[in-house]
A protein has these predicted regions:
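PLP-dependent amino-acid enzyme catalytic core
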Residues: 1-183
């Protein structure tokens, strides 16, 4: 479990970087399942994903000398490299280019996430850069946990369940840590 203080600190570092996305009532799903269903609109982030939260929170915690060497991830205003599979949708690539504002070099390699990740880790090691794991790092999870903080700040009446996608587990770990801590 991630300490709530780390999630709160990550939320502070994300001000002006990530937007606080709305929690939107979904009438169709609510009627279908006979309950109130809200969707957290992380697709409205400039890179169309919650992953910005974790990567940026991690970079904010890095010492300046490590940032100067660069990072291997999708970064904001620091020299960095982003490794993605060749199968990555063009829309995602274009959003990262736009958001990276010339600071991010995109390297398409491998057919799968695992292949791209292995290439990124090898590159980071070879060039003495910091590899920012997309989900398996405490600071990344804290950044992703800010989604849970925002959900709970909406002050909805009686939340019974929170569902989150599970890829690597960083989002659900961060959201779950925050909600469990305050409940």
């Amino acid at each position: 479990m991630i300490a709530i203080e780390k999630i709160i600190k990550a939320a502070q570092s994300l001000k002006g970087v990530a937007i606080q996305t709305p929690l939107q009532y979904n009438e169709i799903l609510s009627k279908r399942y006979n309950c109130k269903i809200y969707l957290k609109r992380e697709d409205l982030q400039v890179v169309r994903s919650f992953k910005l939260r974790g990567a940026y929170a991690m970079m904010e915690a890095l010492p300046k000398d490590k940032l100067k060497k660069g990072v291997v991830c999708n970064a904001l205003k620091t020299k960095g490299k982003l490794f993605m599979p060749v199968t990555t949708p063009k829309q995602k690539i274009n959003q990262v280019k736009r958001f990276g504002n010339g600071f991010v070099e995109i390297i398409l390699t491998g057919d799968t996430y695992d292949a791209a990740s292995a290439a990124a880790q090898a590159y980071a090691k070879e060039h003495k850069m910091t590899f920012i794991h997309p989900f398996n790092d405490e600071l990344v999870i804290a950044g992703q946990g800010t989604v849970g903080l925002e959900i709970m700040n909406h002050n909805l009446e009686d939340i019974d369940y929170v569902f989150a996608t599970i890829g690597g587990g960083g989002l659900v770990s961060g959201v779950g840590s925050y909600i469990k801590d305050i409940s």
